[in-house]
Swiss-Prot record:
One of its GO terms (molecular function) is nucleotide binding. Binds 1 divalent metal cation per subunit. Belongs to the SurE nucleotidase family. The keyword Nucleotide-binding applies. This is 5'/3'-nucleotidase SurE. It comes from Salmonella typhimurium (strain LT2 / SGSC1412 / ATCC 700720).
Length: 253
């Protein structure tokens, strides 16, 4: 199995390094990751400047000023030859649950892999300690995919409780929960009297029902949420069409 491994925490982050070490026991792994923390970069792509790379002695590649999406795009189209069999993103430091997936560079890297035609996993740890647990879960999933490919056309967003592996209760297939919108902005004054702003923490859980990713992780289970690239709200198609007819948009301007 050939694995392109990326993240949004940066090439030296403990999550990606722990996972790379575990995966290299049974797979051919190429790390292509940002040279710095790009958390919250979502699906952003660098279009107005060129991208430089640096290759470390162990073969890991850092993309200077690159986003997670840049890294997967370059990895698939230029840097990993032969091309990968699968794209893996993580292990993220902290969860990507509910609405987090909108902003997550970890999820975006996997989405880019899926968009380019490859199976993809995004893996996050609900904390900052037991990366070995998340690595073991990821290895088990990848071995399963090697034995029997999952042909859903979706990515798997995997969130792992921050527990020793022996304390993880199992695995659940979940849906994304949701949070209250975060509205906190933290202003500060710099030494010259100018105001600068920090984005505040995420909102509290709003929808954390028993079938959500929030509930699974809180209860000690690995959460696996299938996600897809198509953002079309198919269930709203007829409602929007009827509304356009009702208000006359398209028949008169």
């Amino acid at each position: 199995m050939r694995i392109l491994l990326s993240n949004d925490d940066g090439v030296h982050a403990p999550g990606i390094q722990t996972l790379a070490k575990a995966l290299r026991e049974f797979a051919d792994v190429q790390v292509v990751a940002p040279d710095r923390n790009r958390s919250g970069a979502s699906n952003s792509l660098t279009l107005e400047s060129s991208l430089r790379t640096f290759t470390f002695d162990n073969g890991d590649i850092a993309v200077q000023m690159g986003t997670p999406t840049d890294c997967v795009y370059l990895g698939v189209n230029a840097l990993m030859r032969p091309r990968p069999d699968i794209v893996v993103s993580g292990i993220n430091a902290g969860p990507n649950l509910g609405d987090d997936v909108i902003y997550s560079g970890t999820v975006a890297a996997a989405m880019e892999g899926r968009h380019l035609g490859f199976p993809a996993l995004a893996v996050s740890l609900n904390g900052y300690q037991h990366y070995d647990t998340a690595a073991a879960v990821t290895c088990a999933l990848l071995r399963g995919l090697s034995r029997e490919p999952l042909r859903t056309g979706r990515i798997l967003n995997v969130n792992v409780p921050d527990l020793p592996l022996a304390q993880v209760k199992g695995i659940r297939v979940t849906r994304c929960g949701s949070r209250h919108p975060a509205d906190k902005v933290i202003p500060q004054e710099d030494p010259r009297g100018n105001t600068l702003y920090w984005i505040g923490p995420p909102g509290d859980k709003y929808d954390a029902g028993p079938d959500t990713d929030f509930a699974a992780v809180d209860e000690g289970y690995v959460s696996v949420t299938p996600l897809h690239v198509d953002l079309t709200a198919h269930s709203a198609h007829d409602v929007v069409s009827d509304w356009l007819d009702s208000v006359g948009v398209g028949t008169q301007w």
